[in-house]
Amino acid sequence: MKLKKINVRTLAVMLAVFSSVAAMGQSQQDQKSEPDWMKDFTSRITLNGYAQGGWSYQDINGKKTNAYNLKRTLLWAKARITDRWSFMFMHDFSSVVQEFYTDYRLSKGNEMTVRLGQFKHSYSMENPLSPTQLELIDVYSQAVLYMAGEGPDPLNGVNYGRDMGLEVYGDLAKGLVHYELALMSGRGINKSDNNNQKDLIAKLEVRPFDGFRIVTSGYLGTGCAVGTAAWNPDIQVGDNYKRNRYSVGAEYKTKAYSPAKYKDARPASVRAEWLGGKDGEVGSMGGYVTACIPVVDALDIVASGETFDRNTKVDGWDQTNLTIGLQYWYYKKCRLQLQYTRCLCGENISSKDYNWLQAQVQVAF
């Protein structure tokens, strides 16, 4: 009888142990089969950022000024929702929210992608490019700064070359041709449209061989003035006015930039572009040629010549800048820059030509 009780107890203990082990094994198997949501989430998010700050000296109209400056402190996150669908958000901590948009690739390849939101528009070669790659400390040429709506145009206001809208873009003929077609509000960033018209922007880029591209772009729009300009006195605040632009240019690079390490893959490059347009009845035009040549280790020589005329029918609104400088890449996407610019000005810009000395440090990841 006792032996029977012992056997029953032993059997019960063994069954409990086996069932516990089986349950643990099943639990571990279930954990392995279930996706790691946190790991999957973090693998789909990419964070990037950069800061640019430095020092500047000028003697405009004979008055010497110098100041430290923090130009940009940007952080952005890109989320890959699916293989076709992504979202991007960018904020400048020294300014305002810069970009937020979603991309959806309609084609199997790169033939067609749709973008909706607030982003850098595609007019000109320079405007869509990141300041972390561009050679000049002042980033864009005068013509691009003005014509693309970066800030110097008081009629359009400060919009950093960005706008809200819908864009379709893609590559055709195995990458030989790149196109961009956008319908934008024309008002700029973080603002609702202040007229009923929408602006059309088109760009066509041909890449006949590696490193070389020929680019043309056009802008047809209607602006609503947020300020006044001395060189365009007929347009007053609140007026709707014709705002059209065109550009044509070319660029050659000896090799492509490394996406994450500019220091390790720095091409020699030369880029030239001519831009023109009209605000109301006043025409503006200008262009630039910029070159960057690696010389030794991580040191580059930068040279640029650019000119811009705010009013082609009235003398004195033109300015030509001649720049020479050095940049040293000390880590991946981080660099030190030093540049001297001689500014040759029309009488309405400055009473005499002036000097401009700039130094800047860039930290990027």
Please give the residue ranges for each predicted region.
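Outer-membrane beta-barrel pore domains
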Residues: D59-K63, T82, M88, F100-S107, ...
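Outer membrane beta-barrel
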Residues: E34-G186, N196-I201, E205-T216, L220, ...
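N-terminal periplasmic/intermembrane-space "pro-region" immediately following the signal or transit peptide
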Residues: M1-Q52, D103, F365
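Active-site-proximal beta-alpha loop/turn segments in soluble metabolic enzymes
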Residues: A182-K191, V226-D234
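A generic structural micro-feature
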Residues: F41, A67, V158, N194-N196, ...
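Short histidine-centered beta-strand/loop micro-motifs
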Residues: S192-D193, K261
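Charge-dense, low-complexity intrinsically disordered segments
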Residues: L155, K191, V237
